[in-house]
Amino acid sequence: MENKLYVSPSPHIHGGDSISKNMYGVLIALVPAFLVSLYFFGLGALIVTVASVFFCVLFEYLIQKFLMKKEPTLCDGSAILTGVLLAFNLPSNLPVWIIIIGALAAIGIGKMSFGGLGNNIFNPALVGRVFLLISFPAQMTTWPVVDALNVFPMTYTDAQTGATVLSLMNEGVTELPSYGNMLVGAMGGSLGEVSAVALILGLLFMLWKKIITWQIPVSILATVFVFTGIMHLVNPVQYASPFVHLLSGGLLLGSIFMATDYVTSPMSKNGMLVYGVGIGILTTVIRLFGSYPEGMSFAILIMNAFTPLINSYIKPKHFGGK
C-alpha cells in the first residue's frame, strides 16, 4: 500500500514507517486501557469494543467496494483503530444497535464522505461519538456502576449511580473520588476514560516508538491545568482542583489518542502547540461554564476545523529557505 500521509513540510525522507505500522502501534498503546475497562466493566466492555470494530470495518469495506468502486484498504488498520477509539468513547452498557449507528456515522460521515483516510477533516471516532451524544443523550450519559474490587475506598456520594466525576462536579457534588481511584480507574465513565495510569502508559509507549510527539498532549494538559488551577484558586469551593480535571473525563484519552491524529492535527511543532492550547481552552470553558460537563470531544472537533488555517499560517522554514 502506498503511503500518503505526510505530516511535515518538504523535503520528505522516508523513515521506514507506514500507515499500518503507526495504526497498529496506536492499537498496542491502547491495550492497557482496554484491559482496565475489561476489569472494571467486564463483558460489556468486550461487547462494545468488538461491535464497534466489526461494524466500522464492515462499513468501510462496503462503502469502498460498492459506493467508491475502489479496492478496500482494510489492512492499513485505520478502520480498526476508529472502531476501538469510538468504543472507548462509549459507555459499556450501550445497546449494539446504537453502536452500529455510531460506527456508520464515524466511517460514513466522518471519514469516507471526505474521500477516505488522509482526506478527512474531522476525527472520525469523535464524529461518531458526538453524533450519538446528540441523537441519544440519555443512553450516552448513563454509565453502569463500576463492578470490581476497588483498590482505594470509594466514598463519594453517587458511587452506586455510576456517575462520572465531571457529572458530579456539574451537579455541585463536592465529595469526589479519591485520586487513587481516578488513577486506577475505579469510577464511572466511558470505556477509555476511567484509568489515567493505563492511558499514560499508552502515551509513554507512543513517545518511545515516536508514533506521536509531545507537543499536542502536553500543551492540552498544561493549558487545562493552568486555567482550572486559576479558577480553583479564585473559588476552591465552586471549582475543583486542576488535578481532578486532569484525571477525570476524556481529557487524557482525547489529548493522547484523539487530538494527535495525523490527518486532523497541524503539521508543524508550533502549530501543534497552538492547536493544543486551543483545545485546552475550549475544554476548560465548556467544563466550567457549559451545560454539558465534558467538552473534550467538541474542543477537538472545533480545532480540527482550524487545522488547515493553522497549517497555512504556522509552518516551519522550508529546507534551504531564509
Segments from the language model and where they lie:
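Membrane-interface helix-loop-helix junctions at boundaries between adjacent transmembrane segments
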Residues: L85-F152
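Structural signature of hydrophobic alpha-helical transmembrane segments
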Residues: L43-F55, N93-G102, M182, A186-A196, ...
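Loop-to-transmembrane alpha-helix initiation sites
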Residues: I121, A125, P242-G249, M272-V274, ...
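C-terminal ends of transmembrane helices
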Residues: L58-K70, I107-G118, L201-K210, I256-S265
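Long hydrophobic alpha-helical segments that form multi-pass transmembrane helix bundles
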Residues: F122-I200
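Membrane-embedded alpha-helical segments in integral membrane proteins
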Residues: V26-F41, E60-Y61, L86-A87, V224-H232
